[in-house]
Amino acid sequence: MKKIALFGGSFDPPHYGHFALCTLTRELFSPEKIILSISKNPLKGSANAPEAHQLAMAKLMAEELGKTGPVFEVSDWELRRAGFSYTIETLRHFHAIEPNAELLLCIGEDNYQIFEKWKAYQEILQLAHLVVFARSGTQGEQQSSRIIPPERYTWVQLDLPLSSSDLRREIAEGQDWQAKMPSSIAAHIAAHRLYQNEK
């Protein structure tokens, strides 16, 4: 059965931490494709990039990733929907497109810890295998395993010092941030003066 990995997020902006997650997923699971699904940020403010720029930067990210391996795709399905999408709705969408593929849903440890609060979480476990990325040394794996069968998730430890929120602040403050992402994305941010309103 072919595998399709799904990364959801605003990627606002994309950085080398996102690249590390994608390349590690490729190495561990050998998916036929990795889909970057751009989602709306319910906490979006003036400091965030407009959705058109989020999509453009995600496409640049996919182009850079595509130089190193299998096909990387960008989906704007969630952006085009009215309102905000729940993860289960996104999974149903991709399952309808690829009914014979195994979906790998890549999430962070923070979301894993509150997984039982997600809408239709039991159906999520039926539609997808969870790939949980956690910082090395954390002990959170046991805390939610009571509701997630061990065969339905894989725990991956990886240290990622970068965060998009920190990058937005550094850009606004004029710090040295360009080396934390590919030059094509840094050039897009500079050309359009993104993240200048972060406080």
UniProtKB/Swiss-Prot annotation:
Matching Gene3D superfamilies: HUPs
EC number: 2.7.7.18
GO molecular function annotations of the record: ATP binding; nicotinate-nucleotide adenylyltransferase activity
Pathway: Cofactor biosynthesis; NAD(+) biosynthesis; deamido-NAD(+) from nicotinate D-ribonucleotide: step 1/1
Biological-process GO terms, alphabetical: NAD biosynthetic process
Keywords tagged on the record: ATP-binding, NAD, Nucleotide-binding, Nucleotidyltransferase, Pyridine nucleotide biosynthesis, Transferase
Functional description taken from the UniProt entry: Catalyzes the reversible adenylation of nicotinate mononucleotide (NaMN) to nicotinic acid adenine dinucleotide (NaAD).
Family membership noted in the UniProt record: Belongs to the NadD family.
The name this protein goes by in its record: Probable nicotinate-nucleotide adenylyltransferase
Species this chain originates from: Chloroherpeton thalassium (strain ATCC 35110 / GB-78)
Organism phylogeny: Bacteria, Pseudomonadati, Chlorobiota, Chlorobiia, Chlorobiales
